[in-house]
């Protein structure tokens, strides 16, 4: 999972891109990068770390130009600690291309071999985003054949990308001297929207909050399979480039990943989480009598709307029992299980008075590996709770995700091939209540805002095992596991600077 942004303007864009990336920081904390363009020349800075740490004043001054793009990275393939795999990625032909990508390709290995043997292109990293960039570059080269580039050529190239690439991808690319290109996979698994400023500036971003927070008016979502091209005069061109597009956004965006003040594909993330709390309340009643619960406490922060709604419906007190250290990243998206476990107590501290002598119902947005949940239950008991009940606003995560969330291996999922009671014993809580899959889908779908069409399908593969692209086999999942983020020790990774430094690593 990553956050991406692109800006086309008649004024410098470096500060705009920086501000938008800050608003998308929750989508990735591993690395950040920005590219701008002036006089057909790209200027790039990228490195490991948070946005505020990667970009200093001197870096911002070296990013001139009225067009650019950026990314905050959360690795789902390749090496989690490699600075070389920070985005944007660059290739010099045709024209000069830079690209940022949110998602995960399910056929990256086959494409990489095809690029080498047939297209005669070299891939220097383990990142599927570099593969995607080279596919786009080849399709553009094949389409233009040395002739001037037109919007029709761009859309024809994207059609070629859709034919070759499988999986999830929201993409923003900059074509030197020509303009800004954005497109989504034919299933719209990863979000992408566009907005416009009062001065005519266009901004593309993963979430609407990046538009609103930088004073851009939300215009619309990029449709599944659609491509948008903004030329150097900031004229917008768009075309549907997929044969049979079908909107199936990732439901985990609404459960956990997106900011609550965002709207994705017309669905309010905040309202979706309220709805999830409402349906979860019904599940709680069937498992634990509300009279046996003294207080409802959320696990900060994504679960707060669901927990508050649940408490209100059950007529129970809602209290903040955990204080979050905001300077520690989101534990779910930290690379490496050992790093996640260590960070739980660094991230959360209990307010003991809310637990002592009480039966507490803890509400979390989801339970993936169980590492965080077990630590939190133990913290509640140490604070004096008599009984600790755990409720998840999402159903059990039983299946690997192959579309860009860092949970691909079955062995890492606490719910895989286990009953709810077996999971309860692992987490060590007194009762465990999960959301229902169908209820979750309905709750999220019913959060659509007025004026937007209802979403009829979701990618909920980590919950129901149904892969919406229809081309993912057990063998594919095993192959993808081989290329998931390396979990090598970070100190070891920091000392490994031996790889050849090419433009993609600058």
Feature map (PLM): residue ranges:
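Extended, hydrophobic alpha-helical segments in both membrane/secreted and soluble proteins
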Residues: 296-299, 303-310, 314, 318, ...
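PRPP-dependent phosphoribosyltransferase catalytic core
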Residues: 162, 177-179, 184, 200, ...
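Secondary-structure transition/capping motifs at alpha-helix termini
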Residues: 121, 142, 286-292, 312-321, ...
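A conserved beta-strand->alpha-helix junction
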Residues: 55, 130-135, 318-329, 426-444
């Amino acid at each position: 999972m990553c956050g991406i942004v692109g800006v086309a303007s008649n004024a410098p864009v470096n500060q705009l891109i920086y501000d938008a990336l800050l608003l998308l920081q929750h989508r990735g904390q591993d690395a950040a990068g920005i590219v701008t363009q002036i006089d057909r020349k790209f200027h790039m800075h990228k490195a490991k770390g948070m946005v505020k740490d990667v970009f200093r004043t001197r870096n911002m001054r070296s990013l001139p130009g009225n067009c650019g793009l950026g990314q905050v990275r959360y690795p789902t393939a390749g090496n989690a600690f490699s600075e070389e795999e920070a985005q944007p990625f660059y290739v010099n032909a045709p024209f000069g291309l830079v690209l940022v990508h949110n998602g995960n390709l399910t056929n990256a290995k086959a494409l990489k071999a095809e690029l080498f043997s047939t297209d005669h292109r070299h891939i220097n990293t383990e990142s599927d985003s570099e593969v995607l960039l080279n596919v786009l570059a080849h399709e553009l080269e094949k389409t233009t054949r040395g002739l001037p580039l037109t919007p029709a050529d761009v859309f024809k190239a994207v059609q070629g990308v859709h034919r070759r690439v499988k999986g999830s991808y929201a993409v923003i690319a900059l074509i030197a001297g020509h303009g800004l290109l954005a497109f989504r996979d034919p299933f719209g698994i990863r979000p992408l929207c566009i907005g416009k400023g009062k001065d005519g500036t266009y901004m593309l971003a993963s979430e609407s909050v990046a538009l609103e927070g930088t004073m851009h008016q939300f215009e619309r979502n990029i449709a599944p399979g659609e491509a948008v091209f903004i030329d150097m005069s900031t004229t917008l061109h768009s075309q549907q480039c997929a044969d049979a597009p079908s909107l199936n956004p990732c439901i985990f965006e609404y459960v956990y990943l997106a900011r609550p003040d965002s709207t994705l594909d017309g669905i309010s993330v905040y309202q979706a989480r309220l709805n999830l709390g409402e349906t979860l309340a019904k599940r709680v009643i069937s498992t634990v009598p509300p009279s046996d619960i003294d207080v409802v406490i959320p696990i900060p922060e994504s679960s707060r709307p669901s927990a508050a709604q649940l408490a209100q419906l059950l007529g129970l007190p809602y209290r903040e029992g955990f204080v979050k250290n905001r300077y520690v990243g989101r534990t779910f998206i930290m690379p490496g299980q050992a790093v996640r476990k260590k960070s739980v107590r660094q991230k959360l501290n209990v307010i003991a008075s809310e637990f002592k002598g009480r039966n507490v119902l803890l509400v979390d947005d989801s339970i993936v590996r169980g590492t965080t949940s077990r630590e939190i239950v133990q913290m509640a008991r140490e604070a004096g709770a008599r009984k600790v009940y755990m409720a998840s606003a999402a159903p059990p995560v039983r299946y690997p995700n192959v579309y860009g969330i860092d949970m691909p291996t079955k062995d890492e999922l606490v719910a895989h091939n286990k009953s709810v009671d077996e999971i309860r014993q692992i987490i060590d809580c007194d009762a465990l209540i999960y959301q229902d899959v169908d209820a979750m889908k309905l709750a999220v779908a019913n959060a659509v805002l007025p004026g937007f069409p209802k979403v009829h399908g979701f990618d909920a593969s980590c919950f129901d095992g149904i892969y919406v692209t229809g081309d993912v086999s057990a063998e594919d999942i095993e192959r993808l596991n081989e290329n998931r983020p390396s979990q090598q020790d970070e100190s070891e990774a920091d000392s490994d600077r031996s790889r050849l430094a090419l433009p993609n690593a600058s």
